[in-house]
Amino acid sequence: QNHNEAMKQCNNDYNKTAKEGELNENMAKYELLKQEGRAKRGTFHTVHGDIQTPVFMNVGTVGAIKGAVSTDDLKEIKCQVELSNTYHLHVRTGDKIIKELGGLHKFMVWDRPILTDSGGFQVFSLAGLRRIREEGVTFHSHIDGRKIFMGPEESMRIQSNLASTIAMAFDECPSSVADREYIEKSVARTTRWLVRCKKEMERLNSLPDTINKHQMLFGINQGGVYEDIRIKHADEISKLNLDGYAVGGLAVGCLLYT
């Protein structure tokens, strides 16, 4: 409940630019079908097909659903959008290999929308294995221990190689117990990283060898448990007129109060 205003701000600013816009190479179209209070029912039009919202995204971290679930099975259960992870596909299989194979859709044999997480959550979950700088994050692979650097530009390049429908911005996922001073610095850095993500995504979408030139970028709202920081951050990032926004940092060990 503390984050309702932040989510409302993101929704309002996105709807102003998207709900009346035509689907084109720079922006998807969100069609609002029904609204009651803050609850919304809509259709999100993408280059890989429509998504009826609200929606549950089936998670295929490394390009496959666990439990021997095939993409035919996903269609059978009416899956509208599949979620894969940038970090995991980068360290194992490899995003460059997937690009050579025609992108994640062909790799998976899946023709519906795919959302790729930026890898930020996984990187920042490796607390003892990473170092944060303004440029990005240096960390060690959980597979073989090799040193890897990932920043906003690297995350966008990996996701462009994967050619997903929706790419998530590279952000910092601070601990829920981080103090206010750290959260403020972290959020400011996440905003600067988002500007870099947008610039790099626009560049990548213009390249002749890019598989999905209509790849969309979603920003991520952060702010820990501080409502005022989240509202301010939502207002700042909504001005970038991105294709969509997410509310992040709600599953990084938030404390349970009784």
Residue ranges and their predicted role:
Residues K19, N24-T210:
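Non-catalytic, usually N-terminal nucleic-acid engagement modules in DNA/RNA processing proteins
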Residues N161-L162, R189-L217, Q222-V252:
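Alpha/beta enzyme core
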Residues Y257-T258:
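Conserved small/polar residues in nucleotide/adenosyl-binding loops
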Residues V91, S175-V177, V225-D228, V252-C254:
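Flexible loop/turn segments at secondary-structure boundaries
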Residues M7-Q9:
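Short polybasic linear motifs
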